[in-house]
Every structure is written in structure tokens, then in C-alpha cells.
């Protein structure tokens, strides 16, 4: 018997996902298709009768708007929402804004996969002359971050290292109080939570593809260990296609 339930949702497709560009900390909004994905995710939660007590998200609008859309669909827009940079997407450094397929053609698919999916290899850092440096590093939403906290690039390991303290200190106590928690975030920050929950190896987490806009349900025991595999709310075909689309992002176009 599950002691707790936890629901995660990766934001719907963003405008830069649509253009196959590395988004990272750039504040790309949802594409029209991404907005529809978020609506369908919300409808799936509504149809399954889910209610929540508190929500967590990043400070990036694609995740925030996904959460808004879900809360609208389930008619729970009044719920408290905690936003934190610690749930932001991984910072892709110097790759930010580059088209993934073009980068794969230039550097090779293997190198792009290492940058995207290796556990501890960061991409090249974002230098001050990068076209999006000021847009990100000087943004006032990050004004309270120390120099050590504000990244110029991150590996998956780095992303998990800044997300997990928030999970342990802020989210876990809410779950243990019996609060029904919804987290709307990003592929890599959510991957960190999944790795922690399931005790996955570095190799396994590299291959994990979380689909956009599809609610992921965990049933947890009193020690917050999953009692069954993650469950996707949505029809099987939609889930399969979404996961394949995520896996295809770093491949060069033929």
C-alpha cells in the first residue's frame, strides 16, 4: 500500500524545443503545441480525479505556464506554488541557442550525446560574449544567487547537486506531512529527482527520456521509495511517441 503519491510533469514543448535548440536557462516560452500538451496533461489528471495541496516549479516560464495550464484544467488554480531556480533546466552553457541537429552535424552525434546526456561532462561554458549571456546571467530573477551558485554551464551531476537540496529540505517535508505534491519542471531537474527516488545508475539516467506534458505518477512507501515503476497518465501511443521524440532530439538530420 502506498503511503504517498507524487506527480511530476515535464513542461510542454517550448518554442526552442520546436526549433531543436538548446534552451537551458534561456527563458523560452511554450509553443502552441506545448500549450496543448500541458492542457492534455491537465485533462488526464482531471479525468483521474487528482487533487493537490502544494505545487513546485522553476523560475522559467515554460514550466510555470505548464503548471498554470494544468491547474486551470483541474480547477485548482488557487493552490500555493513555490518557484525556485533550483528546479531550473540544466544550464547548457555555450551551447545555449544552438540548433541540436546542426551541432550534431558539426561535432558528431556522439559528442552531442555526451554533452546532453553524460552524467558529469559539462558543455563549454557560456562566456561573456555569448549572445544570451546578459539575458541570463544579468537577469534580476537570479540577483540573489552567489557567484558560486550562478552557473556558466552544468553537467547533469551539477544540475542534480543543486536540485536535490531543495527536494530534501523543501519538498520531502511536505510529502511526509501528507501533502499531495505536484512538481512541474524540466527534463534534467526531473531526471535528478527520478534518479534519487529510484536509485538509478549514472548510465541508466543518461538513457532515461521523460516525455513532455505527460503526468508521471509515483506511488511511494513511508521511506519515499517507489513501490511500483513510474506510471504515465495518457494513452500508450501518446506516451511512446513522446519518449521517441525526446530521444531523437540530439541526432543529426539525414
From Swiss-Prot:
Entry EC no(s): 5.4.2.11, 5.4.2.4
Tissue and organ expression note: Expressed in the liver and brain. Not found in the muscle.
Modified residues (Phosphotyrosine): 26
Residues modified to Phosphoserine: 14, 23, 31, 118
UniProt-listed GO biological process terms: canonical glycolysis; gluconeogenesis
Pfam families, per database record: His_Phos_1 (PF00300)
Active site feature: 11 (tele-phosphohistidine intermediate), 89 (proton donor/acceptor)
An example Gene Ontology molecular-function term: hydrolase activity
HAMAP family the UniProt entry points to: PGAM_GpmA
The protein's assembly and partners: Homodimer.
The protein, known as: Phosphoglycerate mutase 1
Native source species: Homo sapiens (Human)
GN (gene name): PGAM1
